[in-house]
């Protein structure tokens, strides 16, 4: 059993979880965001998005100054008060976006895999794909340690592509709508564990953790949480955890921010 009282950390995915997958609306979650803010409970955003995108959204959601996890864990944006930590303001895991792009271009040219990366198109095209404004779409291209792409080949070729990436120390990860390539050592779980350890070091006590997500790439994050909310999502693969004890895992009936609210209601309102 746990409560909204400190120490508590809430880790949340964005698209399809805190934000509606299509409209990007988050208002159903607003009352809980306000309540958590008033209780001084950090809400740490975790996403495949770039840090530039997430800093914009963090401000919109009233969460500015808190740490966040970008690019599926390849980038950690540090909290404003963590200026003494090496690497401030961001810690980047593994190889850079530019190096990954070079690998992908080589694989495409020499082994003829079919895919389109965000680097291949302009912000107008990304805006069309995502429903974002052009200014917001431009932020999606500011990757530091990953590449986002649309797969345009067969499942058989995908298996071959994944194997080639693994040989090169990279991983191929499915998000809510797109695929992502990043260093094999990076992950939302690794980044979350680092943030949890930092809060523990600063406060002297390990915080209780609650995570919320809707896609396969959220599973590693939810596995390392004390409690998890699996928000009903659009992804056909869904989210499957090794430990789905009902005492610690809740699957919502609603999607997006309404599911986010449902998950918080389940774990806190009854306590």
UniProtKB/Swiss-Prot annotation:
Residues annotated as binding Mg(2+): 13, 15, 214
Family, similarity comment: Belongs to the HAD-like hydrolase superfamily. MPGP family.
Record bears the keyword Iron: no
Keywords linked to the UniProt accession: Cytoplasm, Hydrolase, Magnesium, Metal-binding
Gene3D superfamilies named in the record: HAD superfamily/HAD-like, Putative mannosyl-3-phosphoglycerate phosphatase, domain 2
PANTHER family noted in UniProt: HAD SUPERFAMILY HYDROLASE-LIKE, TYPE 3, PHOSPHOSERINE PHOSPHATASE
Enzyme class (EC, first level): hydrolase
GO CC annotations on file: cytosol
Organism of this sequence: Escherichia coli O157:H7
Name under which the protein is recorded: Mannosyl-3-phosphoglycerate phosphatase
UniProt cofactor(s): Mg(2+)
NCBIfam families xref list: HAD-SF-IIB, HAD-SF-IIB-MPGP, MPGP_rel, PRK03669.1
EC number: 3.1.3.70
Main subcellular location: cytoplasm
Entry-linked Pfam families: Hydrolase_3 (PF08282)
Record keyword Magnesium present: yes
Family matches, as InterPro entries: HAD-like_sf, HAD-SF-IIB-MPGP, HAD-SF_hydro_IIB, HAD_sf, MPG_Pase
Active site, UniProt feature: 13 (nucleophile)
Compartments reported by the entry: Cytoplasm
Reactions this protein catalyses: 2-O-(alpha-D-mannosyl)-3-phosphoglycerate + H2O = (2R)-2-O-(alpha-D-mannosyl)-glycerate + phosphate
GO MF term (any one): mannosyl-3-phosphoglycerate phosphatase activity
GO biological process: mannosylglycerate biosynthetic process
């Amino acid at each position: 059993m746990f409560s909204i009282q400190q120490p508590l950390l809430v880790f949340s995915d964005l698209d399809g979880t805190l934000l509606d997958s299509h409209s990007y609306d988050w208002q159903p979650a607003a009352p809980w965001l306000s309540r958590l803010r008033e209780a001084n409970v950090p809400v740490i955003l975790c996403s495949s998005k770039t840090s530039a995108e997430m800093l914009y959204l963090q401000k919109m959601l009233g969460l500015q100054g808190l740490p966040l996890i970008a690019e599926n864990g390849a980038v950690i944006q540090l909290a404003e008060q963590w200026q003494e930590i090496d690497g401030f303001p961001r810690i980047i895991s593994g190889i850079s976006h530019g190096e990954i792009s070079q690998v992908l271009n080589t694989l495409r040219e020499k082994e003829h895999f079919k895919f389109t990366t965000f680097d291949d198109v302009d912000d107008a095209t990304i805006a069309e794909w995502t429903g974002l404004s052009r200014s917001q779409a431009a932020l999606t291209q500011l990757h530091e340690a990953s590449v986002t792409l649309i797969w345009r080949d067969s499942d058989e070729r995908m298996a071959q592509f994944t194997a080639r990436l693994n040989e090169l120390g990279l991983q191929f990860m499915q998000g809510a709508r797109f695929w992502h390539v990043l260093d094999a050592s990076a992950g939302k779980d690794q980044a979350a564990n680092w943030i949890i350890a930092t809060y523990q070091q600063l406060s002297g006590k390990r915080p209780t953790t609650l995570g919320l997500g809707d896609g396969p790439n959220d599973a590693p994050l939810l596995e390392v949480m004390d409690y998890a909310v699996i928000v009903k999502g659009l992804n056909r693969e869904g989210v499957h955890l090794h430990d789905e004890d009902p005492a610690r895992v809740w699957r919502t009936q609603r999607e997006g921010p309404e599911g986010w609210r449902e998950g918080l209601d389940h774990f806190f309102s009854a306590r």
